[in-house]
Amino acid sequence: MHGERPTLGDIVLNLHPEPVCLNCNEQLDSSDSEDDHEQDQLDSLHSREREQPTQQDLQVNLQSFKVVTRCVFCQCLVRLAVHCSITDITQFQQLLMGTLHIVCPNCAATE
């Protein structure tokens, strides 16, 4: 730079594109034992997911929920209080969105 302030002419860029090799020369040693080990880990994970929780696990994860829905016949509001796990309340929600309908006490007495 010559002078007090740089000018565009003072800045000289010598940039040229350089080819870069993007190939990876790394080789992975894939053996059957590693594949079997990974499969065993996946199987173990899936089997743990399928295991039923113990009674103590169920008691720890229980929560109270308020459910408000409408009677299938008269459309009046029906309020329920349930005590269950988050998994169970999610399943209950799916049932209510499907073919399971709640009936109010008045309609239940007349049906």
UniProtKB/Swiss-Prot annotation:
SUPFAM superfamilies, A to Z: E7 C-terminal domain-like
UniProt record, GO biological process: DNA-templated transcription; symbiont-mediated perturbation of host cell cycle G1/S transition checkpoint; symbiont-mediated suppression of host innate immune response; symbiont-mediated suppression of host type I interferon-mediated signaling pathway
Comp. bias intervals (Basic and acidic residues): 39-52
Bias (Acidic residues): 29-38
Coiled-coil residue spans: none
Domain comment quoted from the record: The E7 terminal domain is an intrinsically disordered domain, whose flexibility and conformational transitions confer target adaptability to the oncoprotein. It allows adaptation to a variety of protein targets and exposes the PEST degradation sequence that regulates its turnover in the cell.
Lineage: Viruses, Monodnaviria, Shotokuvirae, Cossaviricota, Papovaviricetes
Region (E7 terminal domain): 1-44
Record keywords: Activator, DNA-binding, Early protein, G1/S host cell cycle checkpoint dysregulation by virus, Host cytoplasm, Host nucleus, Host-virus interaction, Inhibition of host innate immune response by virus, Inhibition of host interferon signaling pathway by virus, Interferon antiviral system evasion, Metal-binding, Modulation of host cell cycle by virus, Oncogene, Transcription, Transcription regulation, Viral immunoevasion, Zinc, Zinc-finger
Positions of short motif LXCXE motif: 22-26
Zn finger region (unnamed): 71-107
Complex and partners: Homodimer. Homooligomer. Interacts with host RB1; this interaction induces dissociation of RB1-E2F1 complex thereby disrupting RB1 activity. Interacts with host EP300; this interaction represses EP300 transcriptional activity. Interacts with protein E2; this interaction inhibits E7 oncogenic activity. Interacts with host TMEM173/STING; this interaction impairs the ability of TMEM173/STING to sense cytosolic DNA and promote the production of type I interferon (IFN-alpha and IFN-beta).
Protein name: Protein E7
Domain of life: Viruses
Cellular component, GO annotation: host cell cytoplasm; host cell nucleus
Post-translational modification: Highly phosphorylated.
